[in-house]
């Protein structure tokens, strides 16, 4: 499956992350009303936190010896402090604009997340073979992100000069053109 890493962590499923995909990046963060001046995690000691990620929050708070009351909300978590339901929230943050619009500010990042390719650990050999092909293709796209395909028509007497300055793996592909003395150079 292609899923947000944050959801896998929250659901605590025994699923293996095969490949991070590099898109849909976000953070799961604690946020407080903008008039609260501290960024200290201790602020949340004994406070109420609204979230759609109760397992993630409980685990994080326990590791940091913080005891807080967690209110589980499905959607629009950012309104909880404004209606008196919570002292702060924990939610996904990409740009922070939703927090800003609701008078909140990010204080502590619990985890960073992105889209991942994940698999069940009990795949059949046939499905594993299909998955391996998919992984190969995804990794090829990721590796090629910083490369460009160049195609140009070049006079034959300039092919070596142009080839010398092109970034190529081995050598460019050269295809003669109909017009005499010219070739198409691919790299």
Q: Where on the chain are the PLM-derived regions?
A:
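Portal/gating segments that form or line small-molecule/metal binding sites
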Residues: 1, 19-28
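Small-molecule-sensing regulatory modules
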Residues: 2-15, 34-187
